[in-house]
Amino acid sequence: MMNKLLFFLLFSTTVFADNEIFVDQTGNSATIDLEQLGSSNLIGGTSATTTSMTALDLDGVSMTLDINQIGSSNVFRSDAIDGDNFTGFFEFDGDSNVWDLLMNSTGLITADYVDLNIDVTGSSNEADIKIAENADSSYLNLDWIITGDSNVFDFDIDYENAVNYMDINGSTNTINFTASGYSGTTASDSGYFNLDLDGSNNTLDITQSSTLARDWLSISTNSSNSNICVVQNDGGTTTSC
């Protein structure tokens, strides 16, 4: 399968101005490495346009996905990534890229022990990430490194026993983070979010609302004219900034 996929990528670069990748994987222990160089490339999902591509869909246990989109105006869209022990490496270098990720969005399949590593370098990029909104993703490890300006990142996670590290170096970025779930029973296994921010005029809206009120948050900033709103709520009255 990897040989066929590689052939398609090489062939498409000589025929089409914009490359497209379709992946529908079912089975355990799959390792998938996709790299696109240039602009206006697409890794498909149900919302993909161009030639009516369907979803990048991965179903199985112990899968590894390595995505490298190097260039501008590229799009990554996943219809569903479902399964435990998933490892994802996502590198986006360039401007005006779009990244949409759904993982166990329906809550019908577990997505525990997930390790996501995200590296974004560039400006005016957009990300929309939803992980187990209707269930939970236990023992999630989410690491971000964002370098650039005017990026917008929205992520919604239902989890327990999880850690989320975000390192932002840039200005005029917008981060919207909503965390819910049962959370852990002690401080050592709770939902933990660590943010390191360098840059000005950033806007951050963070909500942690675990059932057991075991959420932890650490923010370190070297910033001016930024707006940071944090709400921690275990079921009290509605609060907003």
Where are these regions (language model features)?
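Low-complexity repeat regions of mature extracellularly deployed or surface/particle-associated proteins
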Residues: 18-241
